[in-house]
Every structure is written in structure tokens, then in C-alpha cells.
Amino acid sequence: MAKESYKRDKPHVNIGTIGHVDHGKTTLTAAITSVLAKQGLAQQRDFGSIDKAPEERERGITISTAHVEYQTKKRHYAHIDCPGHADYIKNMITGAAQMDGAILVVAGTDGPMPQTREHILLARQVNVPALVVYLNKVDIADPELIELVELELRELLTEYNFPGDDIPIIKGSALKALDGDLEGEKSIMELMDAVDEFIPEPLRDIDKPFLMPVEDVFSISGRGTVGTGRIERGRIKINEEVEIVGIKPTRKSVVTGIEMFQKLLDEGQAGDNAGLLLRGVDKTELERGMVIAKPGTIKPHTKFKAEVYILRKEEGGRHTPFFNGYRPQFYFRTTDVTGSVTLPEGVEMVMPGDNLSVDVELIVPIAMDENLRFAIREGGRTVGAGSVTKIIE
């Protein structure tokens, strides 16, 4: 069967299910597709096909993730669900599946559990903009307990700087919805309405300020220096002023030509692989790892806080722990930069498989803002991944 072309008639939003093991994340994902399929807004996916998620590699890390798509009357959603707890941590830290919002699934029978807390914390650390809660298994939970669970959840969300009092908490049973029970199905529709309303529409990459990481540099005799790379966000037109940021002191230039596949363009935009001809820039002044950006929109930094995941030995990571002062390479966008790691107080060492917050100081400044993802490497081999949570200087 030929693939249908993707129609862009509705805003697109990326979401995912998060929460403690066995609280019903995958059942809920299957139930959403089943209920929306009856309205012609999704293809039904059964539990098994979501649960046996294929493995993918992102920044050298293997993650199992199921991708499901569906629509509501207002939006088109790409939804991710991960089989294992470690897959969630890796997914959120590597940004393999950038989430514009998430559905936190909590079993009414158990209430918040350790992974519930950990997923909320991670969602805060990696800046998932909004959460909606599905309180699952309410058909088999004590009604008084459910009220307590709701209060506890709102307090927990507030503790991690989410608007605990305002977040919609939808009560239902994903299993009943999946079995075609009307009450269950109603809770799924309520949930989708809450997701439509409460999770904000993301700013598209093309609407953000222009930024292109430099991958390669050429000089064209008599014309100047060309930086090539894939435009990460925004758009650029000929004769616009740009800044070259990172590694060396920031300097300004003007784009005098934009080339793509040997053709000259008036404008380049997010997603394009382009070459930018820069006025008055010598070939020695531009190098891989710098970025070309709209002036004033990004600055170079050397010190930051990050949330990191360290690969297990079985994932191709280190076989031994590391200690305070560890000096690997940090791979940002297109280049490796050496940096030293300071562990949090009270943490003596980090074992393969751990995730934690660390402070990093790089030997040269790199253009960065909060949420920038990076890989941690040793001699070209990926041993971890991270996300910048706070810039220090």
C-alpha cells in the first residue's frame, strides 16, 4: 500500500506517556488509538505492538521507543511510549523524542511511586513544558484513596515547579477503555480534550531565531569563506547580519550568498543543508563546532549544570565508575570539547547506568542555551548523554 502523504492541516505536537512501571502507560497508549480509531482519527495499535518497541540509536545510545500517531479534531500528535524505565531516562536526557508535553500515568490503586517522582523530576530538568495526569485503574481503587492520591499528586507536581493546582487530572480505566467500555472511553476523550487545551502548541523550528552549526569550511578565491551545515532553526536571507559564536571570540559578519546543492538561494531555512558565504571572514577564523546565528540570540559558555545518563557496560559504555574531576569530551552539535566534571556533594563516584546532575567546565566556550543536548565521549566512543539544565558562565 502506498504511503499517504502527510497533510499539514493541523498543528503538530509531540507527546509521550510517563510514569511508574505497571501503572498502565502502554495500556493507555493503546486505548487512545483504539478510541480515536472509532472516530477515524487514528489507526488502532494493540498493546503487544506498542510493548515490543523497536530499538533505535540516538547519539550512540540504544533506546527502545514505540512511536504512535493519532489526531484529535484540533491537532496531529506523535506519541512515544517506552517499555522500560531506563528507556525513559535515556529518551528524556538525549532528547531522542523531544516532548512538547507529557501524559503522566498514575495508578489510583498505588498512588505516586518512586518512578513517578523520578519522571516528574526529569520532565522538569529537561524542560518538558506541560503535563496532564491520567489517574488510571480507578474502577478497582477505593474512592477515598483516589481523593488522597489526587491531593498527593498535586503536591508532588507543585514541589517540582509544575502548576500542581491547575494541571488537569483525568480519572479513568485504560483497560476498560481498551475493552470498549463506554465510561472508560469517555475518560479517554476527556483526557484528549485536556491534552488539546493544556499542552501549549510548540513554536516551530522555522519560527525560532536563525542558527546553523558549522560542519565544514571552504574558501572560494576572490569571494570569501563558506561555512556549511544543516540549519537548525529559523531562516536566513542574503545580506543579513549574523554572529559567529563559540571556540573563539564572537564576531559579526554578513551573509553574502546562500548555496544549496550547487544552487544559489535567496533564503535558507530550518532543515536545509546549506553553505553560507560570509563577508570579511578568513578561512582560519571559522571552524567546525562554531555556530552562525542571528546576532544577540546565543552566547558562548564554558560552565553549566547538566542532567546526564551514563551508559552501562552492556550498552557499550564504561566498564568502571568515574570520580570527581573526570575529563571526557563533550560532543555539542558538531564537535568534541574536553571538559571536567564536578560531582554533587556527597556523591563519591558514578557507576555505569547511573543518571544524575553534574557541573561541567569546558576548556573552550561553546554556543549553548538551556536544553542543549550533548554526548559524553572518550576517544570517539559514546559513554553517556546529557542535557544542559542551567548555564553558570
UniProtKB/Swiss-Prot annotation:
SUPFAM superfamilies: EF-Tu/eEF-1alpha/eIF2-gamma C-terminal domain, P-loop containing nucleoside triphosphate hydrolases, Translation proteins. It is an enzyme of class 3 (hydrolase). It is found in: Cytoplasm. It comes from the Bacteria. One of its GO terms (molecular function) is GTP binding. GTP binds at residues 19-26, 81-85, 136-139. The keyword Chaperone does not apply. Mg(2+) binds at T26. Residues 81-84 are annotated as: G3. Residues 136-139 are annotated as: G4. Its EC number is 3.6.5.3. Residues 173-175 are annotated as: G5. Pfam families: GTP_EFTU, GTP_EFTU_D2, GTP_EFTU_D3. Transmembrane segments: none annotated. Residues 10-203 form the tr-type G domain. Keywords: Cytoplasm, Elongation factor, GTP-binding, Hydrolase, Magnesium, Metal-binding, Nucleotide-binding, Protein biosynthesis. InterPro entries: EF-Tu_GTP-bd (IPR041709), EF-Tu_GTPase (IPR050055), EFTu-like_2 (IPR004161), EFTU_2 (IPR033720), G_TR_CS (IPR031157), P-loop_NTPase (IPR027417), Small_GTP-bd (IPR005225), T_Tr_GTP-bd_dom (IPR000795). GO terms for cellular component: cytosol. The keyword Endoplasmic reticulum does not apply. Monomer. Belongs to the TRAFAC class translation factor GTPase superfamily. Classic translation factor GTPase family. EF-Tu/EF-1A subfamily. NCBIfam families: EF-Tu, PRK00049.1, PRK12735.1, PRK12736.1, small_GTP. GTP hydrolase that promotes the GTP-dependent binding of aminoacyl-tRNA to the A-site of ribosomes during protein biosynthesis. This is Elongation factor Tu. It comes from Chlorobium phaeobacteroides (strain DSM 266 / SMG 266 / 2430). The gene is tuf.
